[in-house]
Amino acid sequence: MKVDDDLVRQVIRPRLRESHKGSYGRVLLVGGLYPYGGAIIMAAIACVNSGAGLVTVATDRENIIALHAHLPEAMAFDLRETERFLDNLRAADVVLIGSGLGEEETAGRALDLVLANIRSNQNLVVDGSALNLLAQKKKSSLPECHLILTPHQKEWERLSGLAISEQSVSNTQRALEEFQSGTILVAKSHKTAVYQGAEVAHLEVGGPYQATGGMGDTLAGMVTGFLAQFASTDSYKAVIIATWLHSAIADNIAENAYVVLPTRISKAIPSWMKNLSL
């Protein structure tokens, strides 16, 4: 699949006048355990700027003040509050887990709680350290849901068993067959590609100026935001355009910047989406 103007406009459409925040999806973001609090903040900033209607963050209690200082638009709670966690999980259209989650006991419990309670009609985006935790589980034990994986090459190696040198298109497609049907894979590298079944979209955007902390967290937030607000659109197309836009904005910023900060990408998302929707 190729990214062109037609595909972009299939996804990023003008908003209906008679709509409200509930029309654009409810999101639960899980992560940001010490010392990785900034990761979930960047994911949340990207998610809100991408247009998700209601964004709630489950994170360390100590991280909530910092989150609200950067993003008062998001709600937040201590991810150790199990009942509140489950209530927000059940209410979400899209769940993102992994940005700054870590791999300690609390992180493992959070992932287990999500996997045990996610429903078949919900989208689950798995990023960062949650991918490493997921790699330790049997694929046959994964829940039935709309699964989106966003690994870099080393994380995909752990998930698929494919060494980086073996991660060809055909090998990656075969490895993806081990996950439930319809799983979407954002295979991040200097040549990022988005897979679903026999489909693959190679993205000819992005560059080394994106090699900085938080870039993947921002992408995961954008993917989550697009899935939430464009729920009536084909999920694969929504993920492709979110991933493309992330790097297209970076390309533009890099014309006058040696390094592109993830937060600069997030700030630019609304204006880019406005222009692309016209």
Predicted feature locations:
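Small-residue (G/A/S/T)-rich helix-start motifs and N-terminal tracts that mark the onset
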Residues: 1-123, 132-146, 153, 157-278
